[in-house]
Every structure is written in structure tokens, then in C-alpha cells.
A protein has these predicted regions:
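Short active-site segment of divalent metal-dependent hydrolases/proteases
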Residues: 9
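Acidic, His/Gly-rich catalytic cores of divalent-metal-dependent hydrolytic chemistry
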Residues: 14-98
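Active-site neighborhood of phospho(di)ester-bond hydrolases with catalytic His/Asp-centered motifs
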Residues: 1-6, 20-24
Length: 98
């Protein structure tokens, strides 16, 4: 089993006989606008795995980011509100005013 993060998209899949688990993102998810984490329980080869989703106050996070002068705030705000990666905003016609 391989567990990893940094992709911001929670999922479980099998690849070449191995279980791959991406835990998603607590602060900047890009698959849903809810935060996610993984619970893994078990011993040896017997285990259970659960992706857990929790509510995330996106507007509060955006307010904090604005208060500390976060660079590229507009792109970050769109990303948090839509769960769409900032590199896709232009081609989708997204702006913070929508």
C-alpha cells in the first residue's frame, strides 16, 4: 500500500497489484469543496480504509488569506470556492466576481 498527498484529490485505486491512496487535502481540496482525510485501521495485510469528508469554512479561510496579504488571492479564492485548479480558471472563464 502506498499513501500519499499533494495531489489535492482523494481517491483509492489499485495499480499493478498495489493499493494507492491519496488522502486528498484538508486545506485546498480539488475534487470537492469539503476537506478530506483518510482513516487506515488494521494489522498486516488485513486493513480497512475510509476517506472522510468534513465541512470546511472556505469563506473564513479566504478572509484569513486576505488579512495576511496572500499573493494571488483571487486565484486561491476561486480554487477554494469551486475546487477547480487555478491553472484551469482562464480556459473555463472563471473570475472571482462570479
Amino acid at each position: 500500500m502506498v499513501l500519499y498527498g499533494d495531489v489535492h484529490d482523494a481517491y483509492v485505486e489499485t495499480f499493478r497489484g498495489r493499493t494507492l491512496v491519496n488522502v486528498g487535502s484538508v486545506g485546498n481540496p480539488l475534487d470537492e469543496t469539503t476537506a478530506s482525510y483518510v482513516i487506515l485501521e488494521g494489522v498486516g495485510e488485513t486493513f480497512s480504509l475510509q476517506i472522510v469528508r468534513v465541512p470546511y469554512d472556505v469563506e473564513a479561510e479566504i478572509a484569513v488569506a486576505e488579512s495576511v496579504g496572500m499573493p494571488e488571492l483571487e486565484a486561491y479564492a476561486i480554487e477554494l470556492r469551486t475546487a477547480i485548479y487555478r491553472g484551469q480558471h482562464a480556459e473555463l472563464g472563471l473570475s472571482a466576481r462570479e
